[in-house]
A protein has these predicted regions:
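C-terminal motif of bacterial Sec signal peptides marking the signal peptidase cleavage site
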Residues: 26-27
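Alpha-helical adaptor scaffolds
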Residues: 74-78, 91, 103-108, 256-267, ...
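Generic helix N-cap/helix-start motif at coil->alpha-helix transitions
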Residues: 36-40, 61-70, 81-82, 95-105, ...
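Catalytic glycan-binding domains that act on GlcNAc-containing polysaccharides
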Residues: 238-246, 274, 333, 338, ...
């Protein structure tokens, strides 16, 4: 794409012509116009102010696209330590998400090699906002930064360790609390990071290979907490009981927490609670606490739930999930005032699932009235002139022309880079710009980042409304639910393709499309058109609901994970929010909560009556 063509497309977008020709869309799709964005009258009286005058330098679209085509080779060169080649590329490229990614890969290679001098030089060139945890760990390990909080986070985390963060921990192992250090060894063993665990144990003075002492005990514990052992928790629990006498209380207490969590993830909540009762809470990770709480929640053991949340690390207690459920636990025990205080805290965490539920517990409902005006054409054009924004849009439009999904993902990364330090008025202007270009996923992304200035028309866009409403009516499903699902599935990207092959706006698998096509008299290739994708997706939503006791929550889980799994996760009849929170797959658990939250916001925007999330979640029937 030439610069002149790109600027022409930009100008026509500013003039309100949003039907940019996109090769990957069908002819039908090209005729579909997004619904016009109309701020609420009250907001329209308040002109947008405070939009930043960004002036980052621009490159030509050809230079931007050429850099993209060199990106993979430069990334590989950085990972392999081709210092001169990487340095030459970075010296000729403007700062971008691409250059930050390449520099980050180079820094990790330098860290692995122990080249402190060159690491220091390159680290200084990486902005604070672009530094990931591993590069920060290397910087702290090399003494470039003093970061005691980072060291503590690495020590306390239940996550797998990166090489940089392992180096930081290894270099400081003599100065940390020994009990917490041995706990970290256990966490590594439970995650099968045995080499790291072995190195740490040796640094602590008791190698795992010893025949006695702490290291030998940890190695013995490993046999019942490894990922393989977690797959057979019953047999592993028997072995742990047999060896408990030769372990310390902390070692056995950690082991019980690991196996209890394995039971909980397998939906065996009563067995999980029995093992959690033997666990040492000081040894539990946040993941263990989460499943301990979910196990208590599933059985409505409110007093236990209250106690478990109170035992969590402070960061866990502050999470909206546990603010809300502790409020519910306190309310169930008659502590109304304390519950209300926690609901107020949860309600202030944004517009997430638990913020909405907490708002309703306080006797209120969500509002989708905008408090910010639509950005003016001049303000939007001002944003478009910024070099970083220009780069993202150049890659976006070229990706459409070339049907290059990988390039589109990089365009998304460049948009995140371009907007990461924008203030709220600028974010809303950027969201409008992205919307004008039909870069829908990044319009939503930008609008979602504001906390005070709110434009719900940009947060919850409704493109292709005629098609969505037509097929929603035809298949008897709620259009707000359909929009909520599309927003989560694809962010309205017609060419979206998942890692497992799901396609289009509604992320329908090709095999599923063939089955649907046979049942309703379609050509399965219509999956790749907008009309066909929405028709198939809405039919599948209706089918999932009918197969899952006409329940939207079950159908949403089934749409993501399959009807069989959604059915397996049922027990006796329970509150929909409890069902959602105890789904064992983190992706599906998050998906259900987001789709259902989206649905109530769309219902409000579309002036439908069902705007209560608690009512929409309802009761999930028993199997």
């Amino acid at each position: 794409m030439t610069l002149e063509l790109f600027m022409y497309l930009t100008r026509i977008a500013f003039n309100g012509i949003t039907g940019i020709a996109v090769a990957i869309l069908s002819a039908c799709a090209a005729q579909q116009k997004p619904v016009e964005l109309k701020p609420e009258p009250a907001a329209a009286q308040q002109p947008m102010t405070g939009v930043q005058a960004l002036q980052r330098p621009s490159e030509t679209p050809d230079k931007i696209v050429n850099d993209f085509y060199r990106f993979d080779s430069m990334q590989a060169a950085a990972k392999n330590g081709a210092d001169a080649q990487v340095a030459q590329f970075l010296s000729t490229a403007q700062p971008s998400a691409m250059t930050e990614s390449i520099r980050t890969a180079w820094l990790k290679n330098l860290g692995t090699r122990g080249d402190v001098a060159q690491f220091r030089q390159q680290y200084a060139l990486l902005p604070e906002a672009g530094r990931d945890p591993e590069t920060k760990c290397y910087a702290a390990a090399f003494g470039i930064e003093q970061n005691s909080r980072l060291l503590n986070d690495v020590l306390e985390s239940g996550d797998k360790l990166s090489a940089g963060c392992f180096l930081l921990l290894q270099k400081n192992i003599g100065s940390v609390n020994q009990s917490r250090a041995w706990r970290r060894v256990r966490i590594l063993l439970a995650a099968d990071q045995v080499a790291y665990a072995r190195t740490l144990a040796a640094a602590l003075g008791s190698p795992l290979e010893n025949t006695d002492g702490a290291g030998a005990q940890e190695n013995q514990l490993r046999s019942v907490i490894s990922t393989a052992a977690q797959k057979t928790p019953q047999a592993s629990a028997v072995r742990l009981q047999q060896m408990a006498g030769s372990l310390t209380g902390e070692q056995a207490g950690f082991g019980w927490g690991v196996l209890a969590t394995a039971y909980a993830k397998d939906q065996q909540f009563d067995q999980a609670l029995a093992l959690y009762a033997q666990a040492d809470r000081s040894q539990l990770t946040q993941e263990h606490f989460d499943w301990f709480a979910r196990s208590a929640l599933r059985g409505k053991h409110w007093q236990t739930l209250d106690s478990v949340i109170a035992s969590m690390p402070e960061s866990g207690q502050r999470d909206a999930t546990w603010l809300y459920w502790r409020g519910r636990a306190l309310a169930a025990q008659g502590h109304s005032a304390e519950a209300q205080a926690l609901y107020r805290q949860a309600a202030q965490t944004g517009r997430n699932f638990y913020a909405v539920l907490a708002t309703e517990e306080l006797g209120q409902r969500i509002s989708t009235q905008n408090n910010a005006a639509q950005a003016s054409a001049a303000q939007v054009e001002q944003i478009s002139k910024d070099g970083a924004v220009h780069r993202a849009l150049s890659l976006f439009h070229t990706s459409l022309q070339n049907q290059d999904w990988k390039m589109r993902r990089q365009a998304q990364n460049e948009w995140r880079y371009a907007t990461r330090e924008m203030n709220e008025p600028t974010l809303l202007a950027a969201a409008q710009l992205a919307y004008n270009h039909q870069f829908y996923e990044m319009a939503i992304y930008s609008a979602d980042k504001t906390n005070h200035l709110l434009n719900y028309n940009l947060r919850y866009i409704t493109p292709y409304r005629d098609l969505v409403q037509t097929y929603s009516r035809q298949h008897g499903v709620d259009a707000a639910w359909v929009y909520g699902l599309i927003r989560q599935e694809s962010r309205f990207v017609m060419g979206a393709q998942s890692s497992v092959g799901a396609q289009g706006l509604m992320q329908v698998m090709p095999a599923t499309a063939r089955e649907i096509a046979r049942k309703i008299g379609m050509d399965s290739q219509q999956l790749y058109t907008m009309d066909g994708n929405i028709r198939m997706g809405t039919w599948y939503m209706a089918d999932a609901r009918s197969r899952l006791q006409n329940n939207e929550v079950l159908a949403t889980a089934g749409y993501n994970a399959g009807p069989g799994r959604a059915r397996k996760w049922q027990g006796s009849a329970m509150e929909g929010a409890i069902y959602a929170e105890t789904i064992p797959f983190s992706e599906t658990r998050d998906y259900v909560k987001k789709v259902m939250t989206n649905a109530v916001y769309y219902a409000s925007i579309m002036q439908q009556p069902n705007t209560s999330l608690k009512q929409r979640m309802g009761t999930v029937p028993g199997r």
